[in-house]
Amino acid sequence: ASPIDFVPLSQSVFPGDTVAIAVGPEVPGINEVVIALLKCFEDTQASMADITVVVPYDGETAGQLKEAIASEFSSVGFQVHDAHDDEALAYLAASAVGDPIMVNRTLCDADVVIPITTVRHDGMLGYNGGFDGLIPEFSDAATQQRFCELISATDETGGLQRRGDVRETAWLLGIQLSVRVVPNSIGGVASILAGMGGQLDVAAEEELKQACSVSPEQAPLVIASVGGNAGAGHWRSLANAAHAASQFVQANGVVVLLSDLNESVGTATRFLADLDDESAGRRVMESQQPDQIIAMELLRLRGICRIYFCCGGRQDELEEIGVGFAADISEIENLCTEYDKCVVLHGADRVIPVQA
């Protein structure tokens, strides 16, 4: 299919153009999506050696993508963004409120920047608008911390500022063509859209609603599953799953988060061992850690209900922060017998609660 409100790729890339493909966090089917896009470049006048794929985090997903690209396109470059490496960052401009916009240097220097991102919705924690997944993911550590603080703001000012910064960054980078991957409720791909501007945003939002909308139904027990890969991006998925579950659970009920996360509790989350919520919240905000968002959401959630994790994490660490631990599905099944009603949310990090 042709891009939405945009010319074919062959008419927008020219000989000598350097191309940066910015891969956002937790894009389902990312290997296949990137390979498909690179194959489209074979029909253009661009040299494959002038294309670099940039990912926001290192880890298993990044390694698999690098191998997939190398097996098909040996001359295509691959880079893992480092928010702490000043040499790998470039000053783009100042934001509307005067904050410096520092962005990955490869993106800044490229003639053509094409982001590949997961479509998210307005109710998600940290949603940054149509170009969600561009920054703070590909910015410096200071910007990432500033965005975390804005996400935790209680009013709408933080969200407006974040989205404004992201839009401005996309404009300054000269981004025209974008690829949006619409997830389904079980972590797969519902559809893939490409194009430019508001028409792409509208189409992507409509596709996401069709794929992930759920009518809210209150229950004393909510079981929320989240997929994805362990890493900095996965903490945001956990936070979104917890946030979605909070809209379905009854007061003083129980939320069980099912995750494939197999690592120790993060630095920010450890501060939840402080039972004084105000003190814990302050320490979390000062931590500047990737798990800051999930820590703040768990702090909010524990004031509403009891929380259990069923994951590969350590039981002692979870219990220290006031979270119950379910070793396997059988323990969850036993928990279900204690309640007369249960809501199960598959892909809770992507669920869109809507009124029936």
Regions found by a protein language model. Name each.
Residues 238-356:
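C-terminal non-catalytic interaction/assembly regions of soluble proteins
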Residues 17-28, 52-57, 223-225:
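Short glycine-rich or small-residue beta-strand-to-loop segments that form or flank ligand, phosphate
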Residues 27-48, 52, 239-248:
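Histidine-anchored nucleotide/phosphate-binding helix
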Residues 20-22, 114-116, 221-225, 256, ...:
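Structural motif
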Residues 48-59, 80, 180, 254-260, ...:
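Short internal beta-strands
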Residues 76-218:
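Conserved, well-structured core segments that form the ligand-binding/active-site neighborhood
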Residues 4-22, 43-48, 213-221, 248-250, ...:
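Glycine-rich phosphate/diphosphate-binding loops that line cofactor/substrate pockets in enzymes
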Residues 67-89, 278-293, 302:
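A glycine-rich helix N-cap at a beta->alpha junction
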